[in-house]
Amino acid sequence: MGQIVEYTSKTVTKQFFGMLGLAKRAGKTVHGTDMICEQMRAKRKPVLVFVSQNASDATRKRLFTKSNFYSIPLVEISASTEELGHLLSGGGLTAAVAIMDDGFAARLLAECK
């Protein structure tokens, strides 16, 4: 079992959403809890996982357990599931998004307060 890597809470800015949209268009994101967990088990693992502030306790626990096991930092952000869903899937609810690229992960973390 891995040790706890990182679990923090951050406030996001307008620039964060712009950078996240750019990462999505570049194909460097995976969104949705099931897809993220599947990607964590794959060879090419996410660099960073963001979870929304109003994600369910079950979703939060599942992502925390998986990210802890695979040593992937998990950051809770002040964005809602509605905001993430609108940005990433054009509507609906999205509780989490994984970043697959080091550069985008570093830049997104820099845009969080």
Where are the predicted features?
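Electropositive phosphate-/nucleotide-binding environments in soluble metabolic enzymes
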Residues: 10, 30, 102
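N-terminal first-folded block
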Residues: 14-51
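Long, amphipathic alpha-helical "stalk/connector" segments that mediate intersubunit docking
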Residues: 2-7, 27, 100, 108-110
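Positively charged, polar, low-complexity stretches
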Residues: 25-27, 33-38, 58-86
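Short basic, glycine-rich beta-strand/loop surfaces that mediate nucleic-acid
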Residues: 71-113
